[in-house]
């Protein structure tokens, strides 16, 4: 929870500057097209803040000088569905004992899977219902965003550090992409894009 709140705080600090940089070309495009929609603008701002929160959560806190000096090599977990083996090995679940079901559901391995899915739910929802992308494009963009995150973790924040300080995991890639698609699958008919209001 502390890490989550710290990530939101960091995103809040960075948001005004990045929003200002994005706003200039955005508003210029709207003026040239002679159309403007405050709803899309608000959703766009919320989406930008959400993306900053995700990036802060997956890349921060950075290792300190002592930790960075000990980093070497780049760690990657390439076994698909390793989280299933982790669940069976680490949780207290005993199928014959119903008392272990609830503790197993709140085990770290389960929460990690759930959080990886939830992390990109807003991402896919924005692409599908605000941008109007079809399911295939939502899947590709969600996969690309997740791959960007995992590549950053594999390379030590794109070679800023000598080694990985977070694990690059193929399961995270799959679960993030699933999260990006999940809400889009609930309503498979073509979504109505937020209309442009002319002025």
Feature-to-residue mapping (PLM):
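Bulky hydrophobic segments
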Residues: 1-165, 184-185, 189, 193
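Amphipathic alpha-helical recognition patches that constitute DNA-binding helices
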Residues: 169
């Amino acid at each position: 929870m502390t890490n989550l709140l710290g990530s939101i705080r960091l995103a809040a600090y960075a948001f005004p500057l990045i929003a200002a940089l994005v706003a200039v070309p955005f508003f210029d495009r709207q003026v040239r097209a002679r159309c403007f929609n405050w709803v899309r603008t608000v959703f766009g701002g919320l989406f930008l803040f959400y993306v900053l929160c995700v990036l802060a959560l997956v890349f921060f806190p950075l290792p300190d000088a002592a930790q960075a000096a000990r980093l070497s090599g780049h760690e990657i977990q390439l076994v698909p569905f390793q989280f299933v083996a982790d669940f069976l090995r680490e949780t207290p679940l005993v199928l014959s004992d119903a008392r272990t079901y609830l503790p197993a559901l709140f085990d770290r391995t389960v929460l990690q899977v759930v959080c990886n899915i939830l992390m990109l739910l807003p991402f896919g929802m924005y692409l599908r219902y605000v941008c109007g992308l079809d399911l295939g494009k939502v899947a590709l963009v969600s996969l690309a965003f997740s791959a960007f995150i995992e590549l950053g973790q594999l390379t030590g924040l794109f070679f800023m550090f000598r080694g990985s300080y977070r694990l690059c995991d193929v399961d995270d890639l799959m679960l993030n992409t699933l999260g990006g698609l999940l809400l889009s699958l609930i309503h498979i008919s073509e979504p109505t894009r937020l209309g442009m209001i002319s002025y």
